[in-house]
């Protein structure tokens, strides 16, 4: 297996300061397309800015199997989690966006309790499901309107994040309820 970390030669130093430059290390980012019944997941690489559909988790009234979700974050070495924020088209909050925000706070709190160095943020996910369904139809990945596309939506969310990472909102774990 090839490590995707770019390692610089130890002789690579800044000629002005004589200090070795740090190696460029990609971070794995987990995008979550939050939903009350299911949640799509995609993994992204911060260096290549690519994403791939990962899984769809069953939700119990908006709550995941926390042990499973935290296990995925640990095992994959995720550095950041981007939770989709389903705003209304005019940018106002919806009932689902309030639940997604609450979920993100709870996730940040649980990550903090586990002493994991993971940042949780929210990112606007308007129209990701529409785009995901269109892509899935065009590629023959789904056969009918009821086939799940949540993981594809999470990929599109990741692309949105990569296009403008500064538009995401970091979540403070202290405010978890």
UniProtKB/Swiss-Prot annotation:
One GO term describing the cellular component: cytosol
Location of this chain's protein in the cell: Cytoplasm
CDD domains xref list: YqgF
GO terms (BP aspect): rRNA 5'-end processing
Origin superkingdom: Bacteria
Major localisation: cytoplasm
Its job: Could be a nuclease involved in processing of the 5'-end of pre-16S rRNA.
Protein name from the UniProt record: Putative pre-16S rRNA nuclease
Gene source species: Psychrobacter arcticus (strain DSM 17307 / VKM B-2377 / 273-4)
